[in-house]
């Protein structure tokens, strides 16, 4: 079975099949899903690479490698604002250095086999691995096959590999300190129901900020939702209603582990009749472009995505400047961004409030 055969069965071009296997933009989701389904049914294992012939022949190229269908990284990862922006800055930095970028996506279902295939094709190329959703063992396996590796958006201190990550603890600490400084004491925490390294560090950083003020997030004020939906979520609605029923009131502020969760939470609160921030303040993390489109504009933590991308590319394109054998762990500091979704607390929102209640 060849790519040409799959293209014929799916009634699409060979280039469309290549885009479907790679995770690159350029075809619709329905077409992509049909191609991938046909490939699975026919037992075809694609070499996980996307490139034009000119790029493959270039001696100045980097590989951007993503493991999909694992944790928060789906086949459509490039449609998620945070990753879309990060990839844009990687491409931009590569162009400025005279390098091309080969995008390669590997389905977790065929992880071992596909990583070996990538290594066969790109053993001498520098590789930026999106590590957001990966375990220590998975990253170690990739590094063993692809020695010129930089891992972006996670960090494992005991691995002798270049890592560039967000200072997650710092960002969440900034969020917690802000809520405490403007007077909030009854604070809730909205976590992702898919756990990754970044979220665990944010949880610790936020708890540290509250602990300094003698506060903590009560278990009844901790919620868990899907991290990749911008719409309101029934599960969030049910958890808020359960909290209100059990406690008689909701927290006066919510910290959300990412902007996606924060925007979803704001929409859910609005549907329930609560005002943001007058009744409940909401703060996110990432400062994606959508954070200034929502109403009210989202208070959040800015992640220096451009700087992270620049550092990752430079570690591969300028190895002499960083020491050819030395490995580094770089945490890029965050910046607090005050907008309109947080304010000082007013009366507790619950039974007896002027705001209409769910139920």
Residue map of PLM features:
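Alpha-helical recognition/docking segments in bacterial nutrient-uptake
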Residues: 59-177, 181, 244-249, 359
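N-terminal helix-turn-helix DNA-binding module of bacterial transcription factors
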Residues: 1-58, 354-359
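Flexible loop/turn connectors
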Residues: 233, 237-359
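Short acidic/polar active-site loop segments enriched in Thr and Asp
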Residues: 13, 45, 60, 125, ...
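Short hydrophobic segments within beta-strands
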Residues: 65-67, 130, 152, 189-190, ...
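Short acidic capping loops at alpha-helix termini that bridge into adjacent secondary structure
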Residues: 185-186, 217-221, 276-282
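Hinge/beta->alpha junction and helix N-cap segments in small-molecule ligand-binding domains
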Residues: 71-82, 103-110, 164-174, 190-238, ...
């Amino acid at each position: 079975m060849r790519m040409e055969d799959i293209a014929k069965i799916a009634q699409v071009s060979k280039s469309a099949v290549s885009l479907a296997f790679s995770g690159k933009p350029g075809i619709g989701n329905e077409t992509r899903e049909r191609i991938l389904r046909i490939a699975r049914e026919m037992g075809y294992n694609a070499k996980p690479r996307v490139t034009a012939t000119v790029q493959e022949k270039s001696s100045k190229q980097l590989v951007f490698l993503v493991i999909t269908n694992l944790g928060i990284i789906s086949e459509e990862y490039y449609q998620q604002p945070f990753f879309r922006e990060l990839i844009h800055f990687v491409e931009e930095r590569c162009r400025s250095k005279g390098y091309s970028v080969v995008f390669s996506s590997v389905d977790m279902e065929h992880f071992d086999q596909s990583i070996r295939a990538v290594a066969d094709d790109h053993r001498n190329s520098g590789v930026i691995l999106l590590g957001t959703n990966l375990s220590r063992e998975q990253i170690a396996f990739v590094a063993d096959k692809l020695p010129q590796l930089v891992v972006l958006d996670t960090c494992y201190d005991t691995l002798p590999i270049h890592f560039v990550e967000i200072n997650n603890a710092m960002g969440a600490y900034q969020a917690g300190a802000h809520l405490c400084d403007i007077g909030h004491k009854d604070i809730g925490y909205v976590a992702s129901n898919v756990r990754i390294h970044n979220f665990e560090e944010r949880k610790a950083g936020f708890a540290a900020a509250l602990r300094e003020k003698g506060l903590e997030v009560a278990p009844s004020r901790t919620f868990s939702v899907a991290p990749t939906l911008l719409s309101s979520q029934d599960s969030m609605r049910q958890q808020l209603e359960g909290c209100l029923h059990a406690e008689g009131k909701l927290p006066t502020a919510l910290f959300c582990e990412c902007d996606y969760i924060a925007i979803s939470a704001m929409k859910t609160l609005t549907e329930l009749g609560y005002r943001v921030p007058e009744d409940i303040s909401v703060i996110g993390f990432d400062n994606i472009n959508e954070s200034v489109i929502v109403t009210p504009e989202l208070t959040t933590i800015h992640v220096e995505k451009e700087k992270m991308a620049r550092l990752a590319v430079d570690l591969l394109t300028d190895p002499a400047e960083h020491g050819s054998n030395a490995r580094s762990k770089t945490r890029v500091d965050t910046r607090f961004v005050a907008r309109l979704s947080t304010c000082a607390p007013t009366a507790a929102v619950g039974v007896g409030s002027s705001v209409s209640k769910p139920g």
